[in-house]
Amino acid sequence: MKRLLTGVVAVALIAIGGVTPAFAEAPEPDALEQILDDTAPARLEGDDMVARTDDVTAVLPADVEQPVTLSTPGGQEVSVTLPSDGGTAATKRVGDGAVEHELGDGSSIIPAVRSNGVLQVMSVMSDAAAPTTFTYEVAAGDGGSLVAQPDGGASVLDRDGQEAATVAPPWALDADGRSVPTHYEIDGDRLTQVIDTAAAAKVTYPVVADPGVSVTYYRYDVIDVRRTMNWTNRGVQLAICKVHNGAARGTCTMSASYEVESAIDATLGASKSGIGATIGVHESRTVKGSVSWTSPSAPAGSSYKAWAVGTLVTYKIQKWVGRKTLGMRYPVWTLEATSRTLSAFDPRVGFAVGQ
């Protein structure tokens, strides 16, 4: 038996270079226009633009010094601090879900939320005097770091070392659609895109570049679910009695009240509440009752114990990782890990007695 547990989403930026190879093989001169034509609807909330899609909420501040933030139900917030020249940027809305921050150094920064909920941040170099490096700070939750990948991209890790996003290999295009050499440099949570215009045979301005991160999702499936009803939980003892010495035989009596809580094993990052909802065991259920029992006649020194009873559920957890790229409404899922056999205990009123 296989059951869907809970989709837990970690959100981030996404790059065109990792998802639309056509731009690298046969790039279009109007790549920026194509991107802006596919932005998600956004509305002004205070001074910020807020775009919402099926699973992502993106906040695009009017102030370039304030980070762009992305969040999803059940996922960590991801913040992206944009490049800035330290001055006051002229900001305007472009497209339905994008803003342009025109800096005073010949460059513009354009964060755009795509229709499928991914975020692209374009850096535009207006002429040869514009800067050729653009630094972003990418944080997952209250911390995180970047780890370089062999393909030229990077992984964005949260403080616990779990991937919150993946940075796709960088791309840069000039006004005629020619690729311009570019690469990333990583320092902690700082991602710097270097556009090597000097290495290009010919460059027609403006040049558009886009660092990016593909969205990382997490899903947990509960599989191999098996139930044992009226199971005696010998790990939860409720009472004990012993036939006293001094006579050949005798009886003993147990009398006690008890409280027994449900128990759920969890691993791989899955929540106990999510597992419980899937297998039908409440995470914080408490059963109260009492034990009142007298043994049959037994030899002196005999002892009896009372244990909790209920339903034993055994299962395994599968952890799936999903990544959504441009042009994809739904992520592609990959199985990352399968747990050992785990168990949950759902108590009921009553007890079992044994020696």
Regions found by a protein language model. Name each.
Residues 87-92, 173-180, 285-289, 342-347, ...:
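Short, surface-exposed linear segments at secondary-structure transitions and domain or protein termini
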Residues 248-299:
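Membrane-insertion modules used to breach or fuse lipid bilayers
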Residues 66-71, 261, 308-309:
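Short, hydrophobic/proline-enriched secondary-structure or compact coil segments at domain edges
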Residues 6-7, 56-65, 125-128, 147-148, ...:
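Short, surface-exposed loop and linker segments with low hydrophobicity and enrichment for Pro/Ser/Thr
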Residues 1-25:
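Secretory targeting and sorting signals
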Residues 210-259, 323-354:
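Deployable pore-forming modules of oligomeric membrane-permeabilizing proteins
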Residues 25-213:
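Residues that cap or anchor secondary-structure elements
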Residues 284-340:
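Membrane pore-forming effector domains from diverse proteins
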